[in-house]
Every structure is written in structure tokens, then in C-alpha cells.
């Protein structure tokens, strides 16, 4: 690896096209996204996530998203055995921010759509119209078996049928305040939600299978996908192309937002040393559990998110795309991400969130041509 990689040069028209949104994937579970005994070990708290999101807002991040996880992977690090709840966390964060978009995740097997519709309308009120919902079908069977609500393994092949009905109920209630939807999974009888959201409620998904992308193409405002590999910032391009093609079939504009971990330092060698240190401490017991769970869905094909998460190539950070390098190198790679057709944004994680966001805002983002449109920072963040 070389330090201070050269900047890409774009015409003005390209710069306009390449403006890219940046989000932070907040650590709602312990230890963030590194399954390693050598990584920072910490519990999730409101105060930690408040500091992260306020710092992200200060540095002009566009959005913050929290996942939902109901059972972890165990192992020496007790990975994701300790988690906050997404909607209540994001409601709190909505109250202590003013500009950044806020997204919570609904585990749709656990929450009736009418309840999600009302909770979302409430957080819309708290945030002043800055809230949206990420819908997930659920892939980790033990999360739901422990509560006695796993619908059986046939659900793996019907989960997007379920989600289609779910989102139709949401759209009814948010759009008109009333639903009489009748389907295989849900029956609404003059169901009411009021007040309705102050602005159209954004729905996001993370479909990577054909069925997931078809769903996003029809119902989502944008679709998350995994980055791929280490320092291969455009390797996800075929996934973005599939999403773009699926959206063309529905006549909708559904962009891809790509998940990456940033591990940066003054030099490429220093950043690489961090990455190798994290890999050397991989929690093999927790990783084995993830691999076992990934093999239980035999009906959704080989291109699902969970299968990528468990791939041994970089399972230590669940195989999200990883950008390892100097500040200039990471900036260059993120500009390359922005050049991929269909890529409208990135969702970032960090090995250390508080210092990582500050370093990103101070040292990386100013070098990114796809973020050159941002206003100057005006004050220090607390």
C-alpha cells in the first residue's frame, strides 16, 4: 500500500453527479462491528450513541441508522449479546439533534405494522420530519424462537410476501390514516393512525437477494447493500447494477447505499497494522455461530446478506466492505465509490466510533471531491 494516494480529478458536471450522502451505522450492539478480542470492547448506551450522532451531525453526516438485534453470537466477546432497542433509541436521538436524518429498524415479525406506523408518526413529530423506517424480515431464527414467534422455516421463502403486505398497511396508515387491508398475513378492520407524519415517511431496506431487490424496487426509497472486499471500493458495482435494473422494471428511482468500515490512520502502513491486529484477535467461537446460522436459510439463494456476512474472507467485521489506509487513501476510495452508477450514498462504521467520526470529519471528508459541496464547519462539537 502507498501513502497519500493521488486524488481523482472530475469535471464540474461529474462533481455534481458524484455528490454522495454519508451516514453512520450507530453501534446499538456491544463492540460495534468488529468480532475481535483485539477491538475496542464496550457496551451500547444512549450516551455513547448520543455523542456519536451529535458528532456526525456536526460533521455534516446526512443520516444515522440503527439496526435491531435480539440475540447475539456469544463467544469470548459476547458479540451482540447486549443490545439497545432501535425505535426507542432513535426517538431519544431525534430529540437531541436538529438536522441529521434518523432511521430506526423494525423487526417486522415482532411488531404489528399499525404499531410501527404509530411509533414512526410519533418520532416524526419529535424530529420535525427527519425520521424514516428500515424494514427487515428477520434471518436469525434463534432471535424469534426464543420468544415463540418463529413462523417456521417456510418463512424463509415467503418473507418478502409477508413484508409486501406489511408495507402496504404502513403506506395506507401513513397516507390516509386508515387501513382496511386484507391479506394472507394481515387483516385491518377500519384501522386508524392519527396524527399522520408531517412529511412522506421514507422506507428503506437491505435486500441483496433477487426477491429483496424486487421488493426494494417496488416499495423502498433506497436500498442498502454490502461493500465487498478490503480496499476494493467498486467491487459492489454488480450489486448496484442489479438494484438499478430492478428499479427500472418498476419505473422508480431507488439508489444503493453501501456499507463500509473505515480504518484510517496517518499512513497506509499504520492503518494496515490496526486491521491486521483486529484480524489476529478474531473471536472464532462467535464467528462459528454466525456461520452456522447463515446455513439455515436454504431457500433464498446464495446472494443473501447473511451469506456474505459469514464468508470467511473477512468475517471479523461481517464482510462489510473495508477501507484501510491513510486519510488520503480512504478519501480517494470513497470518491471511487461515488463514481459507481446507482451508488447514492455510504453507510459507515468505524473501529472506534468517536475518534473515527472526528478523524473522518477533520481529515478525510475535506479531501473527498464527492463531498466538496459541504459548508464549512462553524463550531466545535461537544
Swiss-Prot record:
The gene is rutA. GO terms for molecular function: alkanesulfonate monooxygenase activity; monooxygenase activity; uracil oxygenase activity. Keywords: Flavoprotein, FMN, Monooxygenase, NADP, Oxidoreductase. It is an enzyme of class 1 (oxidoreductase). Coiled coil: none annotated. The keyword Lyase does not apply. Induction: Up-regulated by the nitrogen regulatory protein C (NtrC also called GlnG) and repressed by RutR. Disruption phenotype: Cells lacking this gene lose the ability to utilize pyrimidine nucleosides and bases as the sole source of nitrogen at room temperature. The FMN-N(5)-oxide reacts spontaneously with NADH to produce FMN. Requires the flavin reductase RutF to regenerate FMN in vivo. RutF can be substituted by Fre in vitro. The Rut pathway degrades exogenous pyrimidines as the sole nitrogen source at room temperature but not at 37 degrees Celsius, a restriction that is apparently a consequence of an inadequate ability to remove toxic malonic semialdehyde at the higher temperature (RutE/YdfG function). The keyword Calcium does not apply. This is Pyrimidine monooxygenase RutA. GO terms for biological process: alkanesulfonate catabolic process; nitrogen utilization; pyrimidine nucleobase catabolic process; thymine catabolic process; uracil catabolic process. Belongs to the NtaA/SnaA/DszA monooxygenase family. RutA subfamily. InterPro entries: Luciferase-like_dom (IPR011251), Luciferase-like_sf (IPR036661), Pyrimidine_monooxygenase_RutA (IPR019914), SsuD_RutA_monooxygenase (IPR050172). It holds the Pfam family Bac_luciferase. It comes from the Bacteria. Its EC number is 1.14.99.46. FMN binds at residues 68-69, 134, 143, 159-160, 209.
